[in-house]
């Protein structure tokens, strides 16, 4: 019975690592820090306990947030007047303020983020 949560924990850990790769692509410093944080949290809760299912669920939620809600911006460090460029990938959740009022439904975006 104890082997089933271990498989789920491993699956959750892999999902977190995949999500960090997507969210922090081309930002090695942040990518390594996020992966180190994930590893430390999983190591801290290595033994199966009463709260293991909650910890696994938390890891899956973190992976979802990283994958769907984190957008990184970058600009030329030498030019203070340079515009920020956002790296919006295919899995980013898009919508406008009116879409917040539509609970539980997918929002179809029919326009690009930058006009």
From Swiss-Prot:
Superkingdom in the source lineage: Eukaryota
Coiled-coil intervals: none
Name by which UniProt lists this protein: Mitochondrial zinc maintenance protein 1, mitochondrial
Subcellular location(s) of the protein: Mitochondrion matrix
Stated family: Belongs to the complex I LYR family. MZM1 subfamily.
Keywords noted in UniProt: Chaperone, Mitochondrion, Transit peptide
Protein's UniProt keywords contain Phosphoprotein: no
Molecular function as annotated in GO: protein folding chaperone
